[in-house]
Amino acid sequence: MPRRQDVEKVLVIGSGPIVIGQAAEFDYAGTQACQALREEGLRVVLINSNPATIMTDRHVADRVYIEPITPEFVERVIARERPQGLLPTLGGQVGLNMAMQLEEAGVLARYGVRLLGTPLTAIRRAEDRAEFRALMKEIGEPVPESAIVTTPEEALAFGEEVGYPLIVRPAYTLGGTGGGIAHDREEMRDIVTRGLKLSPVTQCLVERSLLGWKEIEYEVMRDGAGNAITICSMENIDPVGVHTGDSIVVAPSQTLTDREHQILRSAALKIIDALGIEGGCNVQFALNPHAREYMVIEVNPRVSRSSALASKATGYPIAKVAAKIAVGLRLDEIRNPVTGTTYAAFEPALDYCVIKIPRFPFDKFTTADRTLGTQMKATGEVMAIDRTFPGALLKAVRSLETGRDGLFHPAVQALDDQALRERLRTPNDERLWAVAEALRRGVTVPEIHALSAIDPFFLDGIAAIVAMERELADGPLTAERMRRAKQLGFSDAAIGRIVGMDPLAVRRLRLEMGVRPVFKMVDSCAGEFPAATPYYYSCYDEENEAVSPPGRKAVVLGSGPIRIGQGIEFDYSAVHAAWELKAEGIQSIVINNNPETVSTDFDTSDRLYFEPLTLEDVLNVVEQEGDIEGVICQFGGQTAINLAVPLSRAGVRVLGTDIDQMDRAEDRRRFDQLLSDLSIPRPPGGTATSVEEAVAVARRIGYPVLVRPSFVLGGRAMEIVHDEAELRAYMREAIAVSSDRPVLVDRYFLGKEVEVDCVSDGEQVIIAGIMEHLERAGVHSGDSIAVYPTVTLTHRQRETIVAYSTRLALALQVKGLVNIQYVIHGGEIYVIEVNPRSSRTVPFLTKVTGLELAKVATQVIAGHTLAELGYDPDRSGAALVFRTPAGAGWLWPEPAERVAVKAPVFSWQKLTQVDTALSPEMKSTGEVLGVDADLPRALYKALLASGVRVPHRGTVLFTVADRDKAEAMGLARQFSDLGYRIVATTGTARALQACAIPAERVNKVSEGAPAIPDLIRAGKIDLVINTLTRGRDAHRDGFIIRRTAVEHGVPTLTSLDTARAVLTVLSSLREGEEVGISAVQDWV
């Protein structure tokens, strides 16, 4: 059956910003879907608010709208573009919920838009807990005993009836948001109250707990004619009770008997048939390990996180096939692009083991509750492939980049036996390491199984690793022992640590012994058919399947798992680098381990290696590929930059900016000397290797000071301290300082922060744009609202920034990208830091300027000059030009009629016990973009897209630190003048009344009921403005207020600058005033 002819133009809804529970997998799925639809001759319109995605590039869809994903904005896009079809199942829960809202509001009917793919009735039956349960009963599929509740009282009544523990699952939410496991009445009331608030239909499912049962998933695909296949079975190592996004997952399932597999596979196919799914779908089961009994947990009637994993694990392009099914094609008509010969109706076969391990943000949020449950907490994930379970497991562990290359964990090793057993009993992010430690201490596999409910098969695999640790420690390192250790997944570094050798010495010995990895192919058919676009994984087996054709080739290092501080923005640059190398006639070879990303899609590069980003693993690929031009490190974030020096020392050429120049930018002493030579000021500071040295530096330069370890990224453990007592407390509590781990102490200037991204060839520098941060220095740049072009800088300040940026880029001989951050204090411009690599603002500037930074940087790295590429300040209409004897720098032309605002997005609701106050340490997980003719409208769009919905009337709570009171008075007066009611804590209320601003006093927690948290819970406060007093103790009023507000969906602003931005919007836009839309194609 050919594709349907009644549809020529299709609207695809993206998934918006990255939050916990919805990460890069939807950029990968959406990008693949847009390409698939255009292959079928359709015009594609896309709406997505996330500028960091490949999906929102101008060439991916015919019309790209980076606008808030709300019913009003999607309707405006539909009214303008008049698509005949809407594809909602590739934008995660956001896309699905939006389709439901548009249908219910009559928008789709009004504009004659047909829903493509899985019908709305099927979506509703899968997502609505009551309808789903009724359908399962109808087709004879077992579901746990449960109740649909719309009030906490109904949930408590069910709890009384069936007993605890019970699992709470809110309807239509993402990543288990608002859900949890209730062990008693108190927990039930808390979880259900929150869950009902977060469910768009105010509905929760409360079900009997199946804790301890195995969790098994099937990724299935069905077309409109009823043909269906299973693509992959997946088994969660963690039993039921831990969200699948937080579980270690193995594919294919390892512990099922053939009979169990056939029963569950048949059930999955029966369920999607009964639902009438058209496209990809994920079915989750609980399987009783002690009897042949199973329960259906839930169905995701859309492409999901598990789809991305199944897709990368099998080589089957799920999103592409789902998009083609949505426009009427059948499975037996869709060619599998991986093999080029088989069709999509062919079920994948796997002859290897795939493991996914989640990446958690607990290194950033040390106070967060690390217990894992039904509400997801991971920010990203890694995937590893090997022939054996232990081999894939250890490969995945070292892909996580948590400083551990094996199953040794100092914090776990320090636990006493009782605490270790508790760690085994309670699911948490360190349980894998606890299992290994328990085995080392002689705890048996049956005992660990009884405590953790982890299947003995997996425990035996971990036991094999522990046994090899012992064998390596006890005996000589023979060639036979080396080979067995490598087959179990041990890295050279892990072997070296056990036997007391340097990792490179282990490598040399291993190569002398002839113990080398081979590379195997992922091709979706276990080698039955030749693959047209293969990708590879390493293992210590016999036959090498990798083919490395001669010719020019270069390696692009990816950025690994998504985590706070290193997100999808870096994958964006790596993808553009791979594409541009191809265009230059250079074979692009990508190494990465993140299954969610576009960089690990089968057709992004010429060859893909799914490997950890460590020196050993990268060198193995370089050796396999033979004569390469070099490795590009500057697009993979800090992950790739950290490999530049070790690779260079190992004799591998690092392409782009010279290693020594990168060190000049990173090394404190050399960087200070560079700035001194160039006469460019920076805030005074120094390096300390002891507490007393830090105190001496602070006394010399004056308080407040910004202190941070010199060896971390993403602002980790960075803090502003205001006096000596705070400094001593920080040095004592936050970090271990020593001669090889110095602390940087800088004078903190409370000024405006500005940053630039530049591309340089060593002779010419293009400053792509100057971005102004709305929050003052002291809030991490990734957590600030950024505005382009600048709105408050003077012409002289802009000239100075262009001059400084040019001189720095030329002095460092930058070849490719460089990001420079400045602070303006007392009219003077100071350099804060220089990063000679791609930055998280590259996708944002690429979208709004039209200058494809990563592409141009790759052309420069490939050997072109900017002049050869046609970039010239005189011909390009440069906004500002600065010339020196060494070369010229110029500011890319700025739009006269547009302002762009990038706003951060946080995942506070998923992480309990985390302070929401902004600081020098980055906390946001994603970003959105608002673009319009002026700042208030662009800001409005960005705030709306980021989830900050401030009502045009209501009550504002002011509770601010003493040092902020004077400044807060002006803001409070503006809110009051706009008609808001002001309430404040005692000190702030007194200050407001002294300024004749009407304000009512409210109680702090310690002052008795009703206190501020009670008012928030009762819905009597609409906006909280709260700045940080000293200290972040979880028992302090400020912390409790901020957490209560976040958990009850009340917008909370912890920076007066953000509050000022909100006021700009409120005072400029009338309630209900319509704001226009524009497509990326119209911007430049």
UniProtKB/Swiss-Prot annotation:
Q: What Pfam families does the record tag this protein with?
A: CPSase_L_D2 (PF02786), CPSase_L_D3 (PF02787), MGS (PF02142)
Residues at which Mn(2+) 2 binds: 298, 300
Per UniProt, Mg(2+) 1 binds at 284, 298
Q: In which pathway does it act?
A: Amino-acid biosynthesis; L-arginine biosynthesis; carbamoyl phosphate from bicarbonate: step 1/1; Pyrimidine metabolism; UMP biosynthesis via de novo pathway; (S)-dihydroorotate from bicarbonate: step 1/3
Q: Does the keyword Repeat apply?
A: yes
List, in alphabetical order, the GO biological process terms annotated in this UniProt record: 'de novo' UMP biosynthetic process; glutamine metabolic process; L-arginine biosynthetic process
Q: Which positions in this protein are listed as binding Mg(2+) 3?
A: 821, 833
List the InterPro entries: ATP-grasp, ATP_grasp_subdomain_1, CarbamoylP_synth_lsu, CarbamoylP_synth_lsu_oligo, CarbamoylP_synth_lsu_oligo_sf, CbamoylP_synth_lsu-like_ATP-bd, CbamoylP_synth_lsu_CPSase_dom, MGS-like_dom
- Where is the region Carboxyphosphate synthetic domain? 1-401
Q: Which reaction does it catalyse?
A: hydrogencarbonate + L-glutamine + 2 ATP + H2O = carbamoyl phosphate + L-glutamate + 2 ADP + phosphate + 2 H(+)
What GO terms fall under cellular component here?
A: cytoplasm
Where are the annotated segments for Carbamoyl phosphate synthetic domain?
547-947
Q: Which residues form the MGS-like domain?
A: 948-1084
Could you state a single Gene Ontology molecular function term? metal ion binding
Residue positions binding ATP 1: 129, 169, 175-176, 208, 210, 215, 241-243, 284, 298
Which EC number applies?
6.3.4.16, 6.3.5.5
Sequence positions that bind Mg(2+) 2: 298, 300
List of residues binding Mn(2+) 4: 833, 835
Which parts of this chain are annotated as the region Oligomerization domain? 402-546
| Every ATP-grasp domain range | 133-327, 672-862
Q: How is the cofactor bound?
A: Binds 4 Mg(2+) or Mn(2+) ions per subunit.
Residues bound to Mn(2+) 1: 284, 298
Task: Write out the domain note.
Answer: The large subunit is composed of 2 ATP-grasp domains that are involved in binding the 2 ATP molecules needed for carbamoyl phosphate synthesis. The N-terminal ATP-grasp domain (referred to as the carboxyphosphate synthetic component) catalyzes the ATP-dependent phosphorylation of hydrogencarbonate to carboxyphosphate and the subsequent nucleophilic attack by ammonia to form a carbamate intermediate.
* Quaternary structure (record): Composed of two chains; the small (or glutamine) chain promotes the hydrolysis of glutamine to ammonia, which is used by the large (or ammonia) chain to synthesize carbamoyl phosphate. Tetramer of heterodimers (alpha,beta)4.
- Family according to the record: Belongs to the CarB family.
Name of the protein in question: Carbamoyl phosphate synthase large chain
Q: What gene name is listed for this protein? A: carB
